[in-house]
């Protein structure tokens, strides 16, 4: 990176997070920091060894991005009694080429969801993912949605198209095409609900102390604080109390109450700090 026109060395820490998807709360379960010279999947396996023990009943399926679409990771999860859904990328993969050939003679399933038009091709029984301990299912979707784009300074409607591929150990008899599609897209919950929110409003991207134990302690403390605050916000506050008050706004209200002991909490009075000043 460059600072004041001079190139300097940038240091950063990398970690892997396990996060529950598909619910209305952002629920990060645990974090494992990557060690020097190791890749993300190695750290993820170490993390999941703990999570499979501590939170075994929380989930049945591990949803992951394309980095985890490999036999070693699939077999690791299968051996622990868990299924896998992973993004499938790369035109050179035997599995994707095989699926593309078989899908070419199929009519897609079609449905509309979340302002999208979806065409889906779904088959299981693939054995071309080398060294995986069970047959693999592949889902491919072509999706269209109307979006606003800026053209010559004006916002105009434009159709955006995207293609998605997933590989999974879950057979069609156990999970429908639409349910698998939803599970595959839920992989982004960890980005939208945790990483982006925690970096933007909770200081997750700031290293307060360069010590391995301290880094993990700060991250886990942040996770706990976010989960507790969300639980109070979504499970305790009534809709009229939440109206116009974002989650981070509630955090600021709580902080204000702590430093102003005589002030009534807005969730008791129904007025925000801005209303009472």
Language-model segments: which ranges?
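An anionic, glycine-rich sequence signature occurring as long contiguous blocks
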Residues: 83-187
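A short, flexible helix-boundary coil/loop motif
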Residues: 111-130, 199-277
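Short amphipathic alpha-helical "interface-anchor" segments enriched in bulky aromatics
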Residues: 174-209
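Active-site beta-loop-alpha junctions of metal-dependent nucleic acid enzymes
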Residues: 32-54
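Acidic, metal-coordinating catalytic cores used for nucleic-acid/nucleotide bond scission
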Residues: 63-71, 90-92
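Short, conserved catalytic/metal-binding motifs centered on acidic residues
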Residues: 18, 44, 59-67, 84, ...
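A short alpha/beta connector and helix-capping loop motif
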Residues: 1-3, 71-89
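Active-site-proximal, Lys/Arg-enriched surface segment
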Residues: 1-23, 30
């Amino acid at each position: 990176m460059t600072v004041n026109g001079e190139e300097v060395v940038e240091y950063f820490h990398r970690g892997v997070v396990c996060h529950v998807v598909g619910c209305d709360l952002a629920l990060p379960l645990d974090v494992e920091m990557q060690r020097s010279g190791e890749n993300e999947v190695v750290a993820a396996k170490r993390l999941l060894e703990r999570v499979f023990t501590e939170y075994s009943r929380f989930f049945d399926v591990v949803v992951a991005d394309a980095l985890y679409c490999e036999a070693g990771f699939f077999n690791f999860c299968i051996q622990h009694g868990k299924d896998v859904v992973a993004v499938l990328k790369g035109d050179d993969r035997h599995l994707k080429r095989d699926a593309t050939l078989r899908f070419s003679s199929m009519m897609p399933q079609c449905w509309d969801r979340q302002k999208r038009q979806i065409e889906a091709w779904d088959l299981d029984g693939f054995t071309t993912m080398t060294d995986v301990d069970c047959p693999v299912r592949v889902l491919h979707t072509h999706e269209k949605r109307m979006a606003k784009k800026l053209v010559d300074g004006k916002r105009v409607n434009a159709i955006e198209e995207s293609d998605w591929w997933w590989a999974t150990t879950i057979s069609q008899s156990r999970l429908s095409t639409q349910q698998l599609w939803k599970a595959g897209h839920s992989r982004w919950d960890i980005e939208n609900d945790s990483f982006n929110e925690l970096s933007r409003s909770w200081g997750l991207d700031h290293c307060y102390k360069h010590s391995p134990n301290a880094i993990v302690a700060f991250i886990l403390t942040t996770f706990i604080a976010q989960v507790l605050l969300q639980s109070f916000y979504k499970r305790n506050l009534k809709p009229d109390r939440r109206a116009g008050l974002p989650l981070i706004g509630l955090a600021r209200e709580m902080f204000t109450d702590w430093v102003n002991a005589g002030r009534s909490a807005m969730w008791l009075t129904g007025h925000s700090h801005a209303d009472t000043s």
